[in-house]
Amino acid sequence: IYVRPTKDELLYCGEFRELGQPDKKCRCDGKPCTVGRCKFARGDADDKCTSA
């Protein structure tokens, strides 16, 4: 389930965030993104975390 993020979340996660992930963080390649943000921010299997 994807929802529009708040402004702060937009800066962290990009366009979308995924409910159910720790701290509502994006999921990159099946793992929550804890550093920087997801490149695509949609939980895609080929998504990658970018640097902060």
Swiss-Prot record:
Query: Which InterPro entries does the annotation name?
Result: Ornatin (IPR002463)
**Localization (cell):** Secreted
Gene Ontology CC: one annotated term: extracellular region
Task: Identify the main location.
Answer: secreted
Q: Where is this motif: Cell attachment site?
A: 42-44
Q: Which UniProt keywords apply?
A: Cell adhesion, Secreted
* Any single biological process term in GO: regulation of blood coagulation
**What is the documented function of this protein?**
Potent inhibitor of fibrinogen interaction with platelet receptors expressed on glycoprotein IIb-IIIa complex. May prevent blood from clotting during either feeding and/or storage of ingested blood.
For this chain, the family text in UniProt reads: Belongs to the ornatin family.
Its recorded name reads Ornatin-C
Q: Which organism is it from?
A: Placobdella ornata (Turtle leech)
Q: Recall the taxonomic lineage recorded for the source organism.
A: Eukaryota, Metazoa, Spiralia, Lophotrochozoa, Annelida
